[in-house]
Amino acid sequence: MKNLRNIKKVPFEIGQLLANNKRFCSFLVDDTNNPGDVSMSFIELLNEKYITIYPPVEDGAIEQHNRNTYAIILLDSISTADSDANIGVSGNIYITTDVNHILLTENRNRLLEMADEVLQTLDNAKLTSAGEIHINHISHTMITTFRAGYRISFTLSDQQIERAEI
């Protein structure tokens, strides 16, 4: 039987996996040129709005103006037509920063390094809530005139064999 009970947990599990990556957290929290490893829990990152599971916008601007860099995890499409047991799920992770914080020392691109951390952390990772996550592509996007970002598109597979709950 098809059930969205586990699917709705996916953004939280993705956020938890990203929170476990100290390098990824350092790019979110530390806007200096050479951020050191930062360790924060997923709940702390959610509470401080470094990671969100819904678009944190109000009139085109992020609610927390002091957040230079943040990540948004969204499930964009849920299709129940794929099979009897499997629910087709795709989504995006947006990572964004303001134009003043894109480059690090030696012209390293903060957002590309963050995208690489997402790719290394999530591609082919097994989620206890809903199968396996696959990163399909990464594309650049301008969020506003002053904010640049990357959209990291993913799909889930093999949900029907997963029964664990978070």
Q: Which residues fall in each region the model found?
A:
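Hydrophobic residues positioned within well-ordered beta-strands of beta-sheet architectures
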Residues: 71, 89-93, 150-152
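Generic short beta-strand segments
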Residues: 75-78, 96, 156-159
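Small/polar-rich, solvent-exposed N-terminal microdomains that initiate assembly or binding
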Residues: 1-80
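Residue-level signal for secondary-structure boundary sites
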Residues: 81, 101-103, 160-164
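Acidic-leaning, charged glycine-interspersed low-complexity segments
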Residues: 109-166
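Acidic, Ser/Thr- and Gly-enriched intrinsically disordered low-complexity segments
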Residues: 36, 58-72, 100-117, 122-123
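Short acidic, glycine/tyrosine-flanked loop/strand segments centered on an H-E-D-like triad
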Residues: 86-103
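Short, solvent-exposed beta-strand/turn "edge" segments of beta-rich domains on protein surfaces
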Residues: 81-86, 143-147
